[in-house]
Amino acid sequence: MKKVIAIILALAMMFCLAACGGSKEEKGTKIGVLQFAPHASLDNCTKGIMDALNEKGFVDGQDGCTIEFINGQGEGETNQLAAQNFVNKGFDIIIAIATPSAMPCYAAAKDAGIPVIFSAVSDPVGAGLVQSLEDPQTGATGTSDSLNYTAQLELIRAFQPEAKNIGILYTTSEANSLAQLKKYQELAGNYGFEIKAQGITDASEVASGIASLIASGIDCVCNLTDNNVVNNFSVVTAATDPAGIPCYGSEEEQVAQYGCVASETLDYVALGYQTGLMAVDVLGGADVKSMAVYIVSDSEPVYSTANMAKFGLSLPDAYKDAREVK
């Protein structure tokens, strides 16, 4: 009788082990998500990431799955500590949103063998996250938000036919901003523009930086996805609005919430969703080292009638079918 009971118990244990081994999340998958700062485009990335994870069965608190989200509040030290925290806890994967989060995550995780999936990184090669976009060959891959530079310059030219000087405010330590600035400098002349750029080191210099650009005689501001600037964009518009200088955003939320008149916008929810799918693939066994970076560059023109009115601008005929945001 004891032998029969032992056999039954053994079979029961085998059944339980088989049932618990069905998926990664059932084994207790730990996913760390680090967002650099609390601003709209990065919030949208996070939403897309969480949507993808949840749809694929990775839900915090269910089937042993843990998803720990940290917002770095735009502070470099906070992001570094969060990255190391994920590594110390032995997380299975780290998802990092924006270049200033991705870089410390990769630095902390690479020796531990923890894969990093980044989102909204404009220049992954320049940031040292991958060796190439097609074949990363590191412990990181993810999605890149390549701005549609030509479409943005065409939009600015259409809205302000007489404009000559475009002001760009950027953070000197943000690799994504340096890459974007370089592209605008290369292309601006094709549209009759000159780029006047002003670098800053941190958020405390946004006010003085935009003041310097206004003093230099700019006709408008073209905003990047620079995290310091976007996170403090009310400081920018507090100076440009009274000076009668329109701002053009790098994505929709900068038009809807921050006062920009128009933008060739990327869909950051969709970008985040693709990031989440890539993380799911890696958790399922895909090799992060050979997974190509996914680049999003398709854009859509959007505008705000209310913001345009502040500067006496009218909607150009070429943009009559553009989408209005309110």
Located regions from the model:
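Hydrophobic alpha-helical segments within soluble ligand-binding/sensing domains
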Residues: K27, D123-N165, L266-A286
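Extracytoplasmic "Venus flytrap"
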Residues: G28-K56, E68-E77, S173-S177, N227-N231
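Hinge/cleft segment of the Venus flytrap/periplasmic-binding protein
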Residues: V280-K326
